[in-house]
Amino acid sequence: KAKMLIATDYARKMALDMRMVDPAYEDHPDNKASHCARMIAEYYHKYETQKGTQFVFSDLGTYQPGENWNVYSEIKRKLSEDYGIPAHEVRFIQECKSEKARKAVIDAMNAGTVRVLFGSTSMLGTGVNAQKRCVAIHHLDTPWRPSDLEQRDGRGVRAGNEIAKLYAGNKVDVVIYAVEKSLDSYKFNLLHCKQTFISQLKS
């Protein structure tokens, strides 16, 4: 059982970015970080006039102060260096060490001065009312429970989203990144089976 957990952990990390397993691996134009940065930049520029905002979720590779490398910071680097997005407009919820700091970031998202907010399910999936300008939600990984995925999407897909209502047909795009023949496929199927079972119980 312990070996299975270790193998699963490695498989999750490998699907996200090989550098999480071994820092010796080099960046790759076809990894999740590269694809995600490109998609974020597309939405950023598409909704520049409206100051549209985006949420980016991942429970792996989260920002840790003082850490040499993490997926959040890598995508932020790409956004700044490759796509010209100002670094101060990209924030990590883990940077907020107080409720006051957290509220300031949420207010900045609603104001459009922060345009991209990264976070994990536990830290960003609930209690964040920053939906006012949300145009896209990105999932770098998928949680194990359907309810967690719903909570993530609920940061933008909810009442009070003015930009989606006025400029995007009252829709928020949800982008899920996956690697073929990886643990991602297994997790998607598992989520689908769980959601189907839950729906059958409710009906």
Walk through the language-model features, giving the residues of each.
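Conserved helicase ATPase core of P-loop NTP-dependent helicases/translocases
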Residues: 84-121
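SF2 helicase motor core recognition
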Residues: 11, 103-106, 115-141, 145-169
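A conserved SF2-helicase RecA2
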Residues: 147-203
